[in-house]
Swiss-Prot record:
Pathway: Porphyrin-containing compound metabolism; protoporphyrin-IX biosynthesis; coproporphyrinogen-III from 5-aminolevulinate: step 4/4. One of its GO terms (cellular component) is cytosol. This is Uroporphyrinogen decarboxylase. The record marks D75 as: Transition state stabilizer. It comes from Xylella fastidiosa (strain Temecula1 / ATCC 700964). Its EC number is 4.1.1.37. The lineage of its organism: Bacteria, Pseudomonadati, Pseudomonadota, Gammaproteobacteria, Lysobacterales. InterPro entries: UROD/MetE-like_sf, Uroporphyrinogen_deCO2ase_HemE, Uroporphyrinogen_deCOase.
Length: 354
């Protein structure tokens, strides 16, 4: 039995003694111990593909901060890599795929990876982390969204314009839907395998959904998020594994996401939580949404923004703070001060106490 199940209870909108907190990219380059591990390992991929290293990095922030969850150390591009697109990282530039998708013929050759062979290192990491956590806090598994993964698979890496995938959306939408359906199958299998290996909550990162127009979002992102929420087996009762759909720029679609079948919606800092709570109409829990740049402020300013965020959620949720998981609106960045993270966690724990 979990010693700290605040996250899972909040995701079910049950009563908690205070608002739970975890942070996207809580294991990352802002921590000196992460930088030391990265230097010792020699590459990001070695860390991500070695279960013992992935476990160590997952646990690093838990040793520093009294967080309410661990999140698997990995990368959303492990699925495309396992599909044969050859993931590698270029220093200062980020991820690159050596064999990007350029036409329909390449899509027909894609297959859903076998999770216990091509992605066994991920599942072994999940099993090892669960063992090391010893039921102290829940472990979150994750995947990129179909749209976000397709962006990388077609562009070959990060992009400012996403011209190739947008051209495909306009000129060959059937081809893009074929890719998105295959990727959705892979995401569902991947999340199910993480759950079977021991993940106790799951999150989908729709990082690039916000680059789409409303019509395009409702065509190329939302239907596939909904399919994941409705088709991913998550169990019942005490064996239930809640799902969070997080997206940058998803504010206009919260009402629709709330009806997708997910347990929670994660939002960025470009919408007030009060508005998000009203739009979700009590159908889902909400996760977020402090602007990550707040952590560049003083501890007093951080505490002030924590209070404002907590109050904003309650104002849109009938005065109640239940059903809220405190998080940033996006991930931690390398230049952040770990002491300010401590101040953030302390402020959330103190100010959200029921």
């Amino acid at each position: 039995m979990l010693k700290n199940d605040r996250l899972l209870r909040a995701l079910r909108r049950d009563t908690v003694d205070r608002t739970p907190i975890w942070l996207m990219r809580q294991a990352g380059r802002y921590l000196p111990e992460y930088r030391a591990a990265r230097q010792h390992a020699g590459s990001f991929l070695k860390m991500a593909k070695t279960p013992e290293l992935a476990c160590e990095i997952t646990l690093q922030p838990l040793r520093r901060f009294p967080l309410d969850a661990a999140i698997l150390f990995s990368d959303i591009l492990m699925i495309p890599d396992a599909m044969g697109l050859e993931l590698h990282f270029i220093e200062g530039e980020g991820p690159r795929l050596g064999k990007p998708i350029r036409d329909a013929a390449a899509i027909t050759q894609l297959a859903v990876p076998d999770m216990e062979t091509e992605l066994r290192y991920v599942m072994d990491a999940v099993r090892l982390i669960r063992k090391e956590l010893d039921n102290s806090v829940p472990l979150i598994g994750f995947s990129g969204s179909p749209w976000t993964l397709a962006c990388y698979m077609i562009e070959g890496g990060s992009s400012k314009e996403y011209a190739r995938i947008k051209a495909m959306a306009f000129n060959a939408p059937d081809v893009l839907h074929q890719l998105l359906n295959t990727v959705t199958d892979a995401v569902i299998s991947y999340l199910a395998a993480q759950r079977a290996a021991g993940a106790q909550a799951l999150q989908v990162f729709d990082t690039w959904g916000g680059i789409l127009s409303p019509t395009m979002y409702r065509t190329f992102s939302l239907p596939y998020l909904t399919r994941i929420a409705r088709e991913l087996e998550r169990g019942t009762g005490t064996e239930h594994t809640p799902l969070v759909l997080f997206g940058k720029g998803n504010g206009p679609y919260i009402a629709e996401l709330a009806m997708s079948g997910t347990e929670a919606v994660g939002v960025d800092w470009t919408i007030e939580l009060e508005d998000a709570a009203r739009r979700s109409n009590g159908q889902v829990a909400l996760q977020g949404n402090l602007d990550p740049a707040t952590l560049y402020g003083t501890p007093n300013n951080i505490a002030r923004e924590v209070q404002r965020t907590l109050d904003s959620y309650a104002a849109g949720n009938g005065g109640s703070r239940e059903g809220h998981v405190f998080n940033l609106g996006h991930g931690m960045t390398p230049g952040m001060n770990p002491d300010h993270v401590s101040a953030l966690v302390e402020a959330v724990q103190r100010l959200s106490r029921r």
